[in-house]
Curated annotation (Swiss-Prot):
Name of this protein: Large ribosomal subunit protein bL34
Coiled-coil stretches: none
Record InterPro entries: Ribosomal_bL34, Ribosomal_bL34_CS
Domain of life according to the entry: Bacteria
Originating organism: Cyanothece sp. (strain PCC 7425 / ATCC 29141)
UniProt record similarity statement: Belongs to the bacterial ribosomal protein bL34 family.
Length: 45
């Protein structure tokens, strides 16, 4: 039986690259700003 190895956890993903995590730092805000200017539908994970 095969094993699922690379699942990824939602909590970790949200905490590191979620919207609120991005807004906490200056560079994170730059990321959001850049994605807004490019017209991205999804700004953060």
């Amino acid at each position: 039986m095969t094993q699922r190895t690379l699942g990824g956890t939602v909590r970790k993903r949200k905490r590191t690259s979620g919207f609120r995590a991005r807004m906490k730092t200056k560079n994170g805000r730059r990321v959001i700003q850049a994605r807004r200017s490019r017209g991205r539908v999804r700004l953060a994970v």
